[in-house]
Structure formats: structure tokens, C-alpha cells
Amino acid sequence: MSEMSERTGLLVGEDGIRRLAEASVVLTGAGAVGGYALEGLVRAGIGRIRVVDADVFSPSNLNRQVLATVDTVGRPKAEVACERARSINPGIDIEPMSVLVDDSTVEEILSGDFDVLVDAIDTVRCKISLLRRASETGIETFSSMGAALHLDTQKVRVAPLRNTSVCPLAAAVRKGLRDCDTSSITCVYSEEPPISVPTDRDEHGKSVLGSLPTVPAVFGMTLANLTIMHVLGVDAGRGGTKPL
């Protein structure tokens, strides 16, 4: 057991360390939620990760994205994520994929016999395309719903997609996947009604939503923890709505 894994091993044992090292994860989105999910996965010792994100860091990311620094502004998120992972665990098998998630790329994104999909993207159309393909393959999926417009970390919940409530993004995803078997999709979402504040639009016309660093961090680390529990063979919130 490596020195890096010593404290984890005291909790999960040598067999747990082996399971984590042999596990493989596709992570879509390396932003506010995905960056923290990556941090948890890498530090837990997940052996193989594919990071998918077509975006680059901007100054507006600095308030909430753990991978965003003044030095990474303007750089591709997927590449920065891989550099961060290797700085923690040089032996990790990690691959950047700087592509947009859509109908034309989801098959490639999920290719390669991965164990788990961790979904941290927030565009409805892209999310539905990804989760539809994931449901077809049956890959174990842990998906973040809307983390923006929330203040209360104690309202974060875990549930199967079909049992989510309150969250508008979850409602849109449920509607978009109503003809799919979503039994392999477990969600992290908030039961706090979204805060009603004015929203802006970016240069592409996409809504810009207010967000703290704290709520996305809880979402991301919860996604990582669900993945870790699944790899270790521990129940990951399939049965119904569960508070953290």
C-alpha cells in the first residue's frame, strides 16, 4: 500500500484500496461541481479517469471552481484537470477529452469499458443526450442536478432520478428521459427552491446563474463519495431520497 493510500486503507482495507485502484470513471464536466468530484476521486485512489470538457477557464470561474486559478484562466478545463490529478497521484491513468457533449459525441465519450459515469454538466440538451446513452449502456451513473441558485448545503439530497423533486433541472431531465429506463441513474440535487434573482446571459445566450463555492463543492464531493461507495460495494442511495 502506498503512503498516499495509507489513511484511506485504514478505513477500507487493502481490498478496498485494490478496488479503487482498479476502478475506471468517465467524468463529464470539470467546472464547479466536476472539479470537486475529480478532487475526491483522485485523492481516493481511483485508478483511471477520462475527463470530458470542451470549455476553457474564465475569470468568472474563480469564485467557485477549484481548478480555476489566475494561472489557469484561458486554458482548457480538461487539460488542467488532468494536470491537477497527476500532481496528486503521478501514477493515475487519466485522459483529457476536450469535446462538447452532444448526440454526436456521447458514444465516443462512453466508449472504453468504464465502470462509472460521473455527470457534472448543466446544459439540459447535452445532459439528456448523455444520460440517454448512459441508460442504454447500463453504466452506473451518478449525476449532478442544479447546484446554482442555492445557499443551503443542508438541503442537498441523493435519490434515483425518478424520485428527485423541487429541482427544475431534474424535472427537465426526467421529462427528456421519460421513455428511458433510468434505474442506473442516481442524482445529487437540492430540495431548496432555487433563489429568485435576476439572471444574465453570456455571449452564447446561455443563462448565467448565481452560485457560491460551497454548494457545488458539496455536490461534487457527494458525486465522488457515491462513486467510491459503489466501487467498494456499499449502497449508494438507490432506495429513495436520502439526506446527507
Where do the language-model regions lie?
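N-terminal charged helix/coil linker that caps or initiates catalytic domains
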Residues: 1-26
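Glycine-rich phosphate-binding loop and adjoining beta1-alpha1-beta2 segment
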Residues: 46-89
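Glycine-rich phosphate/adenylate-binding loop
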Residues: 110-116, 121-129, 136, 141, ...
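Conserved S-adenosyl-L-methionine
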Residues: 42-48, 136
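Hydrophobic/small residue at the entry helix of a nucleotide-binding pocket
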Residues: 33-34
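Conserved SAM/SAH-binding loop
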Residues: 98-106
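Conserved N-terminal Rossmann-fold NAD(P)-binding element of oxidoreductases
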Residues: 27-29, 52
